[in-house]
Design a protein with these regions (language model features):
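Short acidic active-site motifs
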Residues: 57-58, 82, 106-107, 200-201, ...
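A charged, aromatic-enriched C-terminal amphipathic alpha-helix characteristic of glycosyltransferases
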Residues: 30, 311-342
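Conserved acidic donor-binding segment of nucleotide-sugar-dependent glycosyltransferases
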Residues: 262, 293-299, 309-313
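Nucleotide-sugar donor-binding catalytic core of glycosyltransferases
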Residues: 1-57, 65, 72-77, 113-289
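Active-site proximal beta-strand in glycosyltransferases
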Residues: 86-100
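Membrane-proximal helix-turn-helix segments that form the acceptor-binding/catalytic region
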Residues: 101-116
Length: 347
């Protein structure tokens, strides 16, 4: 299959922050399939040539190469509606939307009509899109690329508890609460003093850790950054005023407090790690709690569960093995995309 893929290549448009989730999990997966011929024109290109020239390059490529599929992993306003409308006339076009639980109101629903199909991970997205007359929606879910995520051979599990991910005020509070309870947490990620972990370092941390955490607590209503998103929005690598859309931004703000499934539990289990995660959306449909993954309710419950599983190695290893087997069987992006392609009649 001939595919034109676009998405953000470098985190926040900054090469020093490393490659994005979509680069590791979607682009590399599609490229690795010998049946695919993938052309990659990342959003980052728009910073080099300008937004309009980047969109023209996409359209010219579609006209010249005649791909079977145009795949966009959406970020901000990189793609122009008129470009998408022309591409939609020429080939099957698909958008993967992240965070529809809060971005649907002020972002996704405006782009969705300009694609053949759009993909969402939120369990309630289809009914929300339907309120706006949008029906070209496929429900999928995060997963992991089994071609790059793997268990790493390490001398032993010398890290009791780890968290790999961006520092946010609510995550920092949980980490501090754990440390105050006597639990030493190894952290790496954007904005932490310890710094980011490279992709290979992250895989090593998953294997070295007895307990890997996925922290997705509800956003605080008083957090500065979420409040700022009522009045401002991201445009590629910039933050710009958005005073004209305060009403819909408010609706998005309140939706953002709903914990959602993230990719990390699939990545940890898919790498053979033992994962404790916060409850989110319909997580129980993807892993059996206490059998394949462990779910905590609040910080006190998290502290209790960490202490328990640090003391019960055999149970921890049984759960990690079951989680790995479930992830490898059902939650790879190969499985996710095969189902998407089936619905697109491209398999």
């Amino acid at each position: 299959m001939r595919i034109l893929f676009t998405g953000l290549e470098n985190e926040r448009y900054r090469p020093e922050l490393g490659k994005t989730n979509e680069h590791h999990n979607f682009y590399l997966l599609l490229k690795a399939d010998p049946k695919n011929d993938v052309t990659y024109i990342p959003f980052d290109r728009a910073l080099e040539v300008g937004k309009r020239a980047y969109n023209k390059e996409l359209l010219d490529t579609v006209r010249r190469e005649k791909p079977d599929l145009f795949w966009a992993f959406m970020y901000t306003d990189e793609l122009e509606y008129d470009t998408l409308d022309e591409i939609k006339k020429l080939t099957t076009s698909v958008a993967w939307f992240s965070d529809d639980h809060w971005r649907l109101e002020n972002y996704s629903r405006f782009y969705a009509p300009h694609f053949t199909k759009v993909i969402t991970t939120w369990s309630k997205a289809k009914e929300q899109y339907a309120k706006y007359g949008i029906t070209n929606v496929i429900r999928s879910q995060w997963g992991f690329n089994s071609g790059v995520y793997r268990s790493v051979v390490v001398p032993g599990q010398d890290i009791n508890v780890s968290f790999v991910g961006m520092r946010t005020p609510h995550r920092e509070k949980i980490i501090n609460d754990l440390r105050n309870a006597g639990i030493n947490v190894f952290v790496r990620g954007y904005k932490w003093d310890e710094g980011r972990a490279s992709f290979d370092e992250m895989l090593e941390i998953f294997s070295r850790s007895k307990v890997n955490l996925n922290l997705n607590p509800p956003m605080s209503a008083l957090a500065i950054k979420p409040l700022a998103q009522i009045f401002f929005r991201r445009r590629r690598n910039l933050i710009v005023p958005d005073f004209l859309h305060i009403s819909r931004n408010l609706r998005s703000f309140f939706q953002k407090r709903i914990p959602q499934i993230k990719a990390r539990p699939f990545e940890i289990t898919g790498s053979g790690g033992f994962c404790i995660t916060g409850s989110a959306d319909d997580m129980e449909n993807y892993f059996v709690p206490d059998k394949e993954i462990v779910i905590y309710k609040d910080t006190k419950d998290l502290i209790d569960k960490i202490r328990y599983y640090l003391e019960h190695e055999d149970e921890r290893r049984v759960i990690a093995k079951a989680g790995y087997e479930r992830a490898l069987k059902e939650h790879t992006y190969n499985a996710r995309l095969s189902e998407v392609f089936r619905q697109l009649e491209l398999d």
